[in-house]
A protein has these predicted regions:
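An N-terminus-focused feature that recognizes amino-terminal "leader" regions
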Residues: 2-334, 345-348, 358-364, 420-422, ...
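Short, glycine/serine-rich, charged loops/turns that create anion-binding
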Residues: 186, 375, 425
């Protein structure tokens, strides 16, 4: 009897375990398959191009430039890209998007607010910290501001923003702030179509685009699907509804709608922006200490306390380094856990003069490469063995490298630096040459038969390079050997 009960319990456990594994596997396949289903039939790429931004929208204190997301390479990867140039004391108005995105700080510094729904307002002022800036709310009372966390950022930071999360940023430096953003429209967090959408919570961004209407009409005649146009969501509501919802008068409700605001989506702040924020030096020191010692256990972060940015500009934190060729630094779900939720990652590469990056392919992700300095000769080859890109890419240009397409880069005389945004939280690659390459892992006889060469030739091919990913130029090493 006991044996029968034990056997029945064992079978019940097997059934429950099988159902749990099946459900988990189905859920994972649904998440991973959503991108493939959306882009099915859209990756027949015969030619890739290094592109400059195609459209620009001017505002009072800056400009936003857009790459043409209707281009085949962007449609294949399911991404959209733009570049913001924000002047000193420029405030990028609060907005949210329909897809998660990564931001890379190319130049400058500033601070930002990210409004996580339901999270507490942990930054609170006191009467002492207000000084003379607080305004009185009745006799003997001083207004004490409180808001969600303010985060500093600087050149080299990668910032992660989930879909539908409102955020703003401010340039508190003395030079222009240059920011590149890539949205992952094929992500499972985007339940709309593959058109990027920005929902602004202030101003009158639509007004700024009136000067570009002729350009937009021409763009539509060429087959573009949607304008790079956006507006203040409050402007669509009746004034009475807003007045009732916020408990204010109609005049203040009209200010929410920005009806008379012609400054655009990046506005200039008079004086300086007064917000509660920690000293920059203290926050940067904490980030550096956390970056060198951080070991996540998967339990210590909630959505309200999650780290949203990581700096990948520090040479001492490189993941791959060759003192004669260059370095590669990655940020992924291991060192920035929020990326496991966004299913995105990024890398920053530096190639020294004439150095080469080994031919490789991304195993599980598309890559969007943006050149930040210098130039390089880049070649990309597809599954048919045909070159779909063989050209130089220069600073400010962008190219999409589809999943599994093989790519190699060789820096010019001034070197080459780039940042690549990848559509997987832990993007992996495999090389074709070097000590950790696919060819190095094959038996000599397999190489000899596959390439119709002798075993000695196959052995030389297999052992020809001891470098891994970053490779020194043969011409440079040859000159050093002669010397």
């Amino acid at each position: 009897m006991a044996k029968s009960s034990l056997l029945s319990g064992f079978f019940c456990f097997l059934v429950l375990f099988h159902c749990s594994v099946a459900y988990s596997g189905r859920q994972q396949r649904e998440q991973q398959g959503q991108r493939g289903q959306r882009q099915q039939g859209e990756c027949q790429l015969n030619n890739l191009n290094a592109q400059e931004p195609q459209h620009r929208i001017q505002a009072e204190a800056g400009v936003t430039e857009f790459w043409d997301y209707n281009d085949d390479q962007f449609q294949c990867a399911g991404v959209a890209a733009c570049r913001h140039i924000i002047q000193p004391r420029g405030l990028f108005l609060p907005t949210y998007t329909n897809a998660p995105h990564l931001i890379y700080i190319v130049q400058g510094r500033g601070f930002q607010g990210v409004m996580m729904s339901g999270c507490p307002e942990t930054f609170q002022s006191s009467q002492q910290s207000e000084g003379g800036g607080g305004r009185r709310e009745g006799a003997g009372q001083r207004f004490r501001d409180q808001h969600q966390k303010i985060r500093h950022f600087r050149e080299g930071d990668v910032i992660a923003i989930p879909a539908g999360v409102a955020h703003w940023c401010y340039n508190d430096g003395d030079s222009e702030l240059v920011v590149v953003t890539v949205e992952d429209l094929g992500n499972n967090q985007n339940q709309l179509d593959n058109n990027p959408r920005k929902f602004f919570l202030a101003g009158n961004p639509r007004q700024q685009g009136q000067g570009q209407q002729q350009q937009q009409r021409e763009f539509h005649r060429r087959g573009g699907r949607e304008e790079h146009n956006f507006g203040n969501v409050f402007s669509g509501f009746d004034t009475e509804v807003l007045a009732e919802a916020f408990g204010v008068d109609r005049e203040m409700a009209r200010k929410l709608q920005g009806q008379d605001d012609n400054r655009g989506h990046i506005i200039r702040v008079e004086g300086d922006l007064q917000v509660l924020r920690p000293p920059r030096s203290r926050e940067e020191q904490e980030q550096q200490e956390r970056g060198s010692e951080y070991h996540a256990n998967g339990l210590e972060e909630t959505i309200c306390s999650a780290r949203l940015h990581e700096n990948i500009n520090d040479p001492s934190r490189a993941d791959i380094f060759n003192p004669r060729a260059g370095r590669l630094t990655t940020v992924n779900g291991f060192n920035l856990p929020i990326l496991n939720f966004l299913r995105l990652s990024a890398e920053r590469g530096v190639l020294y003069r004439n150095a080469m990056m080994a031919p490789l392919w991304k195993i599980n992700a598309h890559a969007v490469l943006y050149a930040t300095r210098g130039e390089a000769q880049v070649q990309i080859v597809d599954h048919r063995g045909q070159s779909v890109f063989n050209d130089r890419i220069r600073e400010g240009q962008l190219v999409v490298i589809p999943q599994n397409f093989v790519v190699t880069k060789q820096a010019g005389n001034e070197g080459f630096e780039w940042v690549a945004f990848t559509t997987h939280e832990n993007a992996m690659f495999s090389t074709l040459a070097g000590r950790t390459s696919a060819l190095r892992a094959m038996p000599v006889d397999v190489l000899a038969n596959a390439y119709q060469m002798s075993r000695d030739e196959a052995r030389r091919l297999k052992l020809s390079k001891e470098e891994t990913v970053m490779m020194e130029s043969r011409s440079r090493s040859g000159r050093r050997d002669v010397a």
